């Protein structure tokens, strides 16, 4: 049955597990066990916040291990969950990390990146609250440049009206704006470790604060461009940076969600001839242990505790098994959920049912050219057939196969749509077969291997 948007009664503890599942059903087909597991985990967070006294700190999240092939919805479930709750969400592949002491990123950068996301989220929220005031201040600065600070109130009011009406958008002015050139080269890059930077020692921030943040430069620009630069500048001045950082750290610590993908790739399979690789993979697992169990990570914003961050790990486990992970790591991922491979019926539902289904997306895109695209039921079934066939014969990449199928199917229409204004195009099973049969005949075609 098609999921529809529902209005829920206000619950002081947020959405109930069944409501969370209903919300996820709007975007994701099937995988009820996984949805149920994340819904319970989310509700338990709300429950924990209402527990009184010291017991609250002892209640830790039950981290989740999702097992399933690529493209079955593992990442999408976690991403939608974070969006639903406005939680800071960070996704990373486990293969990006190496053991501390080896070349590569260390696992603590996960928390530094999560906090960065939380800070940006809080800043954006704070800026929306001061947007009107910031816009007024920006207009005043532009008026100073246009008519001078000593101009009469009548003159300023007249030019202000012109700015608001957009009459002066293309007028060039000379105005002082903040110098955004990085001081000291930004974050300190660790030699021999590409992509790794010291979260605590950010030389750019330290030198910038020491010199003061009032460094400006005069530039010539159009009024509309000046507005785009000055409004964020004024917003920065109006918001309480220290308060935002504290709120962001609290948000990351209590509501943060970390999604570690491809965790099966760092499992030790016991294969011979790869001893160094085995050591490195096991080292990454050991580095993850304190992070998932609960530790304090130093960031440039201050120390961050990971005790109540929800960790969701996932992997296909085609070669390795969950039992190949270190026993200690298995113990820190107590909720284990297996996601089902997608069937033909699932593919049909994915094409049609979600609020942002692929069929709706492509129809909307082509619709911008004043071309009405319609898919017959027979076409949907045929597309699902082809997706399942290619997944079985080449490599199972789940629902992601539908993207490739549809791109090939609609390639000519997408190319010619601008010349077809006012037309209605019906995609039926014969059209699908004509477009895809030759490609499907050769299943080794590189364009079908994503």
Curated annotation (Swiss-Prot):
Question: InterPro entries given for it?
Answer: AAA+_ATPase (IPR003593), ATP-dep_Clp_protease_ClpX (IPR050052), ATPase_AAA_core (IPR003959), Clp_ATPase_C (IPR019489), HslU (IPR004491), MCM_dom (IPR001208), P-loop_NTPase (IPR027417)
One GO biological-process annotation of the entry reads: protein unfolding
Q: Which UniProt keywords apply?
A: ATP-binding, Chaperone, Cytoplasm, Nucleotide-binding
Give the record's subunit note.
A double ring-shaped homohexamer of HslV is capped on each side by a ring-shaped HslU homohexamer. The assembly of the HslU/HslV complex is dependent on binding of ATP.
* Function (record text): ATPase subunit of a proteasome-like degradation complex; this subunit has chaperone activity. The binding of ATP and its subsequent hydrolysis by HslU are essential for unfolding of protein substrates subsequently hydrolyzed by HslV. HslU recognizes the N-terminal part of its protein substrates and unfolds these before they are guided to HslV for hydrolysis.
> Belongs to which family?
Belongs to the ClpX chaperone family. HslU subfamily.
Q: What is this protein called?
A: ATP-dependent protease ATPase subunit HslU
Q: Which organism is it from?
A: Rickettsia conorii (strain ATCC VR-613 / Malish 7)
Lineage runs: Bacteria, Pseudomonadati, Pseudomonadota, Alphaproteobacteria, Rickettsiales
